């Protein structure tokens, strides 16, 4: 059975991302990080369904470094500690935390020493206002980047891409 269309069409690298020009356009913040091979810790915030987690994974894939994706809702302290230990085995590592606003303060605090010493880069994704929802110590060590809804034109680009892509509909249907 095929996976859902949205899953199959999910961007794998930054240059696959549609829209978000402030982040991934020619002079976008993340594009500059990638071109300079210089990653920083970030928190992507914005409405649900805008691609925050997808952008996080696309950035990690584009940086060609080890990464682990965690969900703040279900993560345990042991999983955080195990992930940090795994990061220490890699020259460059990223921890992606989805729904980071749901990560309790004591678990956020576990990240701080290794975030400070460069053991890993943090990419958080949240629908909440990071100024209110995140530990000030985490906020001060990350760049806060807003992810916005796609414009109508950007949505049309995505639909056209899905229609012609072999991973999408592969031109098997006619649309008028």
Model-derived features: positions:
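A short helix-turn-beta junction within AAA+ P-loop NTPase domains corresponding to the substrate/partner-engaging
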Residues: 65, 135-149
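Walker A/P-loop
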Residues: 2-3, 32-70, 85-86, 112-113, ...
